[in-house]
Amino acid sequence: MMRILSKWIVAAGAAVAVLASANSSHAQQKIRVGWTIPAEESKYWMMRRPAEFPDLGKTYNIEWTQFQGTAPMTQALAAGALDCATQAPLSLANGVVGGNLKAYIVAQHVFEKPGGFSVYWAVKDDSPIKTIADLKDKTIGISVIGGGTYGPFAMLLKKNGVDPAKDIKLVEVGFAVSEDALRQGRVDAVNMNQPFAARAEAKGGIRKLFSLSEEMPNIVHILEACRADFVDKNPDLVKAYVRDITSGMKKALANREETLKVVSEQLKAPVPVLDTYLLKDNDLGRDPGAAPNFDAIQKMLDIYAATGMLPKMDVAQFKHPTIVAPLQ
């Protein structure tokens, strides 16, 4: 964790520079929101179908900024360059420890459910890598070092005698280019997430090495968090945003056909590929009201603390008494 936290000063400064144009002179009307891909259907609906949300563009506006993963958004939140953003429990907790971030979890996007999809690491069919132990001295791709998938990934490696800090070369490879990186030999193994996993599986030539559910079942992958100072200063504005996140989730689940189009537009992924998994039993899980599962998040924080990745942490610090999905 120290190696990740040592980057905070530089990374936070970079986040401010990247988002310098996102001034907060009209903070009461505008929210600066970070997003990423995949699995943020409520936000994709808000971006692609804004007319479906009566308050959006009228009562308040959103300034959207895309990131590769949750860890850079944590840094941007801590630097005050974002107001709300997609987060993973580990990246958010690292923001508290390394960046003095104070935030509220206001909604939840996706989680791993029994029998559903679990983020996994793949190798080529002809790879000599057969077990996790075989990853020693290999180049491994991960979406973001220190992001949401890093925690259970690192725990699985350690359990199998591989030190993720010393025994492998860990490189950042975005989900969208994971398949290409693997097939071209730039990495020996790489993490796969939907819809890119479905696309790669359809082509063949790769196989699953391990999935995160083997170490940590029922993972809360991504949630929505807002800076506590921003929420406390602008409660009505954030309530409007959380109402729209709630509404967006309901729209996504109620109209799968339109959601396929929305996600296709946002991810530039063909509808036939998305149709193989999106909002089906083999997909990630979604709460119908985008409600955060604080009990599950606490269990994840406890596991991270028990393995030395984080100090002991109480999820209660992330709970706002009234501003949390579902809001009507």
PLM-predicted stretches and their roles:
Residues 21-27:
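Sec/Tat signal peptide C-region and signal peptidase I cleavage site
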Residues 29-162, 169-172, 188-194, 218:
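Short, glycine-/small- and polar/acidic-enriched structural segments
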Residues 90, 170, 176-265:
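Pocket-lining segment of extracytoplasmic ligand-binding domains
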